[in-house]
């Protein structure tokens, strides 16, 4: 990758996903837009409700209702052709602001063994953190989030989640123990554990080592993607990347590294 480390966050914040959205009641009238990979679909709901003049609260891709995840992570999970064709309809409403801040608190706890850094922040600063995501404003986000990453405490673990898409029962998928479990189309499971940023001999923990520790059957080698690889922000993640550096440069705005398994 030719992008320098210092510009990786800016590049990620600038990345967009083009969308082609229709309402179930008006399939021939699309709403065309592009949204940041770090944004959330629910932020479009007021505009969509006004555009379609109909209640809008849930998003569907090929009849699968999408979860309340960052757009970039959803794109990694479903690997759609672009523009991504979605259908919006009425359904369960999302409270993404509270969900986002709760995820930030959880990431803070994982990093240091407590959530003191985020809990000590003022209401004004936590509001600014969320507003920076709404506005896709990396500069404003960095001013607040840097305080969480450069806390006067020992960094213990990297907030890390591994998403494993399930193989539909009729897809003829691999039935070996290393393959993702069969399930409904579009479903997935999440593997999450406390992953130290340092090895027992005080060397930086690498992504491949963490994957092998978490799922040795699926990742028998810590050096090479023998049976499976993982995607982060639309590209294959290198197994030799230090987790601590990845956390600082390539985590989602809520502080989590979110990898999607590709078999």
Q: Across the structure, where does each feature detected by a protein language model lie?
A:
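Ubiquitin system architectures
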Residues: 1-34, 41-263
